[in-house]
Amino acid sequence: MAATAGRLFRASLIRHVSAIPWGISASAALRPAASRRMCLTNALWSGSDQAKFAFSTSSSYHAPAVTQHAPYFKGTAVVSGEFKEISLDDFKGKYLVLFFYPLDFTFVCPTEIIAFSDKASEFHDVNCEVVAVSVDSHFSHLAWINTPRKNGGLGHMNIALLSDLTKQISRDYGVLLEGPGLALRGLFIIDPNGVIKHLSVNDLPVGRSVEETLRLVKAFQFVEAHGEVCPANWTPESPTIKPHPTASREYFEKVNQ
């Protein structure tokens, strides 16, 4: 009886170990959840060949593209410290910055989320909302918000943190790393009609520029309002170009004196 139980245990253990993603040790996979998350995080940020091998997004879903309608999403978010169901429909008539980050309680992620939150009023001034998304639960989001910033937490938030626990939103937006089961740093600017105007995806170790995101929102809005196009490094104080062979000369003569 004992021998049979031992064989069953060893067979179960072998199956468990064989299912562990590359770049993560068997001993790490058997640790408690918090320890496993730290091990997973270290492996993904290590830049090793095994970690890079795990960086494969799903090929069974059509990735969204600029000029196409944004994939629909719905889920539970933490908004002003409360749980709230939100969806893409809630942002009709507004610009939306939807950005994905890998995990709560990590390192680069809080710097990005806090930076967007601190600039929330400037986004609101141009009729734009900001929503952050990760594969963590809304309970994890709330716990992170309730953690002081000096301890790596988020503190008070002026933007929504959306839970994608099923990973379906990340998958639909083409940013899910199927192996480790987390999202790359994808950022989408969606216009009031639900059309994607901009998308970018960073590898895990590098954060994004909030100032550049705000500049892009303003640029797309300027084009819509004035019918002129925005040159490289455009700011609201910069000259723009009339998209016509003759009329465009005004701009080129002005900047090339």
From Swiss-Prot:
It comes from the Eukaryota. InterPro entries: AhpC/TSA, Peroxiredoxin, Peroxiredoxin_C, Thioredoxin-like_sf, Thioredoxin_domain. Pfam families: 1-cysPrx_C, AhpC-TSA. The modification N6-acetyllysine is found at K92. The modification N6-succinyllysine is found at K84, K92. Residues 1-62 form a transit peptide. Keywords: Acetylation, Antioxidant, Cytoplasm, Disulfide bond, Endosome, Lipoprotein, Mitochondrion, Oxidoreductase, Palmitate, Peroxidase, Phosphoprotein, Redox-active center, Transit peptide. The modification Phosphothreonine is found at T147. Signal peptide: none annotated. Predominantly expressed in adrenal cortex. Also detected in liver, renal cortex and medulla, and adrenal medulla (at protein level). One of its GO terms (cellular component) is protein-containing complex. It catalyses: a hydroperoxide + [thioredoxin]-dithiol = an alcohol + [thioredoxin]-disulfide + H2O. Gene3D superfamilies: Glutaredoxin (3.40.30.10). Its main location: mitochondrion. It is found in: Mitochondrion matrix; Cytoplasm; Early endosome. GO terms for biological process: cell redox homeostasis; cellular response to reactive oxygen species; hydrogen peroxide catabolic process; maternal placenta development; mitochondrion organization; myeloid cell differentiation; negative regulation of apoptotic process; positive regulation of cell population proliferation. Its EC number is 1.11.1.24. One of its GO terms (molecular function) is identical protein binding. Belongs to the peroxiredoxin family. AhpC/Prx1 subfamily. Thiol-specific peroxidase that catalyzes the reduction of hydrogen peroxide and organic hydroperoxides to water and alcohols, respectively. Plays a role in cell protection against oxidative stress by detoxifying peroxides. Acts synergistically with MAP3K13 to regulate the activation of NF-kappa-B in the cytosol. Required for the maintenance of physical strength. PANTHER family: THIOREDOXIN PEROXIDASE, THIOREDOXIN-DEPENDENT PEROXIDE REDUCTASE, MITOCHONDRIAL. Homodimer; disulfide-linked, upon oxidation. 6 homodimers assemble to form a ring-like dodecamer. Interacts with NEK6. Interacts with LRRK2. Interacts with MAP3K13. Interacts with RPS6KC1 (via PX domain). This is Thioredoxin-dependent peroxide reductase, mitochondrial. It comes from Bos taurus. The gene is PRDX3.
